[in-house]
């Protein structure tokens, strides 16, 4: 099957859902050699991935994952594809705590850095959170405190079959897209930032195929895989099967534009300091961009009005609720690890 799939991709032919599902299952079971994995990823990238292929690949990853089974319903994730090359501060990670502080349960799926100096796992580790939990421990965090961090390597063991090849070929592949789609908790809402606007409509459709009810697929001004504060953001909104697109402008909600430099961070420890300062109430562009992204996360959790969601995001920070979520996650993640 490997040779047939490669030949078809190199001819520019698309795989149907069942073919794509079978192919990803074989990849995740280690049935491809490293050379075949590389050939598959490059051929697929050159052809261009379809909605059907991405949906099947994501479903295969979810089925191979260690499921995070929670008692909590209405879970939301805030994440990006990475790969925008803009070296921004960990905006979606900070926003996750603000969303949780507003009462929306968060299952934050993430990993170490892909394209920046600090991925979500890196900054949380620098903040003192124990990221090395199994599925059961992560579910306990979500159920007890309303937020948990789903560390991808612990929950997607089958990814080891492609990890080395991904690193060595050194270019963006379908796996950069699949990471945010493969959350092993039963999320119903998502804010998904993408590195190119060409992916937005496709990924909104994929999220619908995967059973997500409310999602915002965003590509911000300046090429950000976040809701931007440097200019407007193109949004594709999924709401129970219906997809709309529009331009979101922060100026309409009383914010001022900033420069890209204002949103950039440093290494994991610098970003940890910045994140803690935001949750502790420090004003400025970083707080503002986190508020915007958190408001979309709150809407993904079921709030319909953006202004109302923005009020909830501000209160989450100003009343110390977001900072409290971080402190509780820090404490509980270590308690769980020590208990074994």
From Swiss-Prot:
PANTHER family: ANTHRANILATE PHOSPHORIBOSYLTRANSFERASE
GO annotation terms (biological process): L-tryptophan biosynthetic process
Binding site for anthranilate 1: 80, 111
Source organism per UniProt: Carboxydothermus hydrogenoformans (strain ATCC BAA-161 / DSM 6008 / Z-2901)
Family in the record: Belongs to the anthranilate phosphoribosyltransferase family.
GO cellular component, one term: cytosol
EC number assigned by the record: 2.4.2.18
Binding site for Mg(2+) 1: 92, 226
Protein's name in the database: Anthranilate phosphoribosyltransferase
InterPro entries, A to Z: Anthranilate_Pribosyl_Tfrase, Glycosyl_Trfase_fam3, Glycosyl_Trfase_fam3_N_dom, Glycosyl_Trfase_fam3_N_dom_sf, Nuc_phospho_transferase
Primary role: Catalyzes the transfer of the phosphoribosyl group of 5-phosphorylribose-1-pyrophosphate (PRPP) to anthranilate to yield N-(5'-phosphoribosyl)-anthranilate (PRA).
Quaternary structure, from the entry: Homodimer.
Gene that encodes it: trpD
Binding positions for 5-phospho-alpha-D-ribose 1-diphosphate per the UniProt entry: 80, 83-84, 88, 90-93, 108-116, 120
Reaction catalysis annotation: N-(5-phospho-beta-D-ribosyl)anthranilate + diphosphate = 5-phospho-alpha-D-ribose 1-diphosphate + anthranilate
Binding positions for anthranilate 2 per the UniProt entry: 166
């Amino acid at each position: 099957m490997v040779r047939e799939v490669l030949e078809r991709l190199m001819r520019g032919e698309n795989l149907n859902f069942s073919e794509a599902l079978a192919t990803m299952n074989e990849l995740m079971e280690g049935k491809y050699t490293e050379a075949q994995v590389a050939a598959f990823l490059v051929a697929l990238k050159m052809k261009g991935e379809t909605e059907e292929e991405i949906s099947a690949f994501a479903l295969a990853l979810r089925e191979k994952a260690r499921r995070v089974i929670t008692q909590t319903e209405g879970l939301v994730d805030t994440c990006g594809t990475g790969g925008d090359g803009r070296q921004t501060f960990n905006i979606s990670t900070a926003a996750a705590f603000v969303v949780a502080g507003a009462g929306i349960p968060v299952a934050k799926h993430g990993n170490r850095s892909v394209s920046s100096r600090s991925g979500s796992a890196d900054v949380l580790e620098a903040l003192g959170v124990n990221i090395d939990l199994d599925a059961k421990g992560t579910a306990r965090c979500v159920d007890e405190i309303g937020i948990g961090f789903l560390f991808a390597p612990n929950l997607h063991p089958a990814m080891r079959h492609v990890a080395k090849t991904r690193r060595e070929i050194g270019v963006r592949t379908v796996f950069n897209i699949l990471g945010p789609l493969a959350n092993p908790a039963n999320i119903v809402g998502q804010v998904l930032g993408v590195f190119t606007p060409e992916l937005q409509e496709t990924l909104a459709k994929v999220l619908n195929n995967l059973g997500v009810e409310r999602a915002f697929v965003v590509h911000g001004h300046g090429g950000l895989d976040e809701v931007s504060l440097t200019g407007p953001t193109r949004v594709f909104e999924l709401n129970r099967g219906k997809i709309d697109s529009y331009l979101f402008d922060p100026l309409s909600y009383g914010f001022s534009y900033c420069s890209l430099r204002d949103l950039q961070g440093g290494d994991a420890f610098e970003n940890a300091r910045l994140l803690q300062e935001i949750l502790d109430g420090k004003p400025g562009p970083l707080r503002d961009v986190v508020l915007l992204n958190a408001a979309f996360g709150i809407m993904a959790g079921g709030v319909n009005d953006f202004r109302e969601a923005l009020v909830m995001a501000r209160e989450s920070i100003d009343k110390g609720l977001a900072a409290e979520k971080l402190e509780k996650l820090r404490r509980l993640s270590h308690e769980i690890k020590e208990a074994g």
